[in-house]
Amino acid sequence: MRKNKYITPAAIGCLLLFAAIGLYTIAKDIDRTKSNRDIALTGAGESAILLPADSNELDSVQKVTEEEKAAIESEVLKISNIYRAIYLNAEKVASPYFGIDNIGQKDIDEIENVLISEGYPIINSDSIYPDYLENPDGVYTFWENVKNQKDAETTIRSISTSGSLSYRCFQFLDGKASCLLAGADWNENNEIEVNYVEKREILNWDMTYEQDFYYQDVYLDRHWEATKLIRLHPVNKELYDLTLKYIMPIGYHNVNLFLLNWNADNYGNLCFNDLFDCLYRVENDEYLYADDYPYYTEPYNHSAIPAQLFEDTILPYFDITIEEFRERALYDAQSNTYPWQDISCDNILYYPSLIPEVTDCIKVDENTIKLIVNVMCLDKQTDNLFIHEVTIRTLSDGKFKYIGNEITYTGDIEIPSAQARIPVQRFSEEDTDENS
C-alpha cells in the first residue's frame, strides 16, 4: 500500500501565515508570465515550455464541452467493465482518512496488469518505488508533435487506493495546451460513476533529462505543489534504495546537511541541532513533538532536549569528538540540555518541493561510498537545480556515518537556504563562501 504523509502541528500554523502572503507570490508569478504571453512554445531542440497566454485570473480552469464529458463517461464505463470483477472480489478496508473503502496493493496491481495487457497507458503504482507509466509510447509521440507545433493529444489513466479510476488527457490544439481531468468512483451499488470533470490550462510542461514528463496546471503558490511529474519508465531500484536510505530521511527543507560543503575535518556551518528531529524520526520511526520537552523563550525560543537523548540520536551518524559537538550544538552544561527549534513561522525557510535522485554510487574504499545526487525542482522549471556528492561510511552493524557533502553544480536558480533555525547559529554568506 502507499505511504501516508503527515504534517506537524507547527507546520500547520505556518500554512496560515502563507495564506496571508501567498497572493503576493502568485501576483509576481502572473506578472512574470504575462510578460511572456506572446510566447507559445519554443522551437524543437530547445526547452519546450508553454507559457500561459491571456491569463488574467488565478484560476486556470477552462470550460468542458458536453462532447468531452460524453467521451469520458463512455471510456470510463468501458475500462471499468474490464476490471469490475477484480474490484468486486477485492477485500475492502475502511480508510481512516477519507471515509471510503480501500483495496490492497495486490488487487491494485492485478487491475493495473489487466489494463496494461489491454494496451492502455496506465500508471504502475508501488508501495515503495515511484509510480511510472506503462505503455508510454503515446506520450513520446505526443511530445514530438507538440515540439513541431502539431495538434495532438494523449491520455493517461491511473487506479487509486479505493479502486477508482483517474483520467488525464493532455491536449495541444491550435497552439494552446490543456489537460482534461476526470475521476470516477464506485458507488454503493458497485457501479462506476464519473464524479468530476474539469479542464485546466497548461502553464508549463517539459521533459526531464531522464525523459520523464512534467506539467503545471495550477498557479504556483505556497500551499501546494503546482507541478506534477509523470515518470515514463521505472527508476533504477538499486540507486533509488540509496536515495531512500541516505537522502530522503534528511531532505533539504530547514536542514542544511546537503546544502553546504563540509567534511569530518571541517564541519563549517553544518547545523547539528536542525538534524535532531530528522534523525529522531529515523531512529524511532515516529515524529518528535516540541510539547514533550521544556520550552524557553530566552535567550531565544527553544525546546530543551536532554543531553543523552540528543547525543545518542545524532552522534552515531558523524565522526566528531564530544567536545566539538557540544560546542557546535550549544550544549548547556548547567541544565545538561541542548536547544532545538521545531520548524515554525519564526524560522521556516520556504522552498518548493525538491526531488533528489542518486544517479551514481562510487565505491571509495571497502567501507566508503560516494553518492552523486541530482536535485530537481519542477515548480522552478528545472530538472537540474543542483548536484551534490555525499560521502558515506558504512559500518559492520548495518548503520552508517555521514562523512562529507560537496555541492558540485548549481545553475542560475538559487538553491534552498542553508541557514539554521536557531538565530545564533546563522551565518553570513561570506562565511559560506569561505567554507566552500
What does each model-identified segment do?
Residues 2-14:
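N-terminal Sec-pathway targeting helices
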Residues 12-13, 29, 42:
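Short stretches within intrinsically disordered, low-complexity N-terminal or propeptide regions
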Residues 12-22:
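Core hydrophobic alpha-helical transmembrane segments of single-pass membrane proteins
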Residues 23-34:
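Hydrophobic single-pass membrane-insertion segments
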Residues 32-436:
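Mature, Sec-exported extracytoplasmic domains of Gram-positive
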